[in-house]
Amino acid sequence: MSIKTEQYVTDNYPYAKKAGEKFAMDPLVILAQGSFESAWGTSNLSKKYNNFFGITAGGSKNEYWDGEIYQAQNKYKLKFRVYKNPQDSFYDFARLISSKYKSAHAAGQDYKTYAQRIAYSPYISESNGDSREGYRSAIINLYER
C-alpha cells in the first residue's frame, strides 16, 4: 500500500464505519467507492469541499447537507454538494445509496454484487465519460486491496 493509500484508509475508515453501521452497508465498500471518487482523498472536491463521492447538488437538503454548492469550472459545469466535514459526506453518501439505489444497497454487504449494481445504475453517468464496466472493476479492485 502506498503512503497516500494508507493515509486515506487511516483518515477515512472511521467515517465509513459509522456510515456503514448507520445505513447497513459494508464500510469497506463505502471506503472503496470513496477512494475511487476522490482519488484517495486528493481531489479538489474532497480536500476543499469534503465531498468524497462526487455527489452532485440535486435533491433536497438533509441532515448531512445544508444546501451549499460548488460549481465545477470545467466543460460539464456540474454543481456539487459541499459538506461541513468528511463524516457528513460519508453519511450522505450511504443515505443516498440506501434511499435511491435500493438494489445496490440490498447488496451492500457483498462487494462484488454491490459494484455490479451501482455501476449499472443511474448513479453512473456515461454522458460525463464514466465507463460502467470500468467503474465496476475499479470498486472491486479497490475493495480487494
How should these model regions be labeled?
Residues 1-145:
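Catalytic cores of secreted/periplasmic lytic hydrolases that degrade extracellular macromolecules
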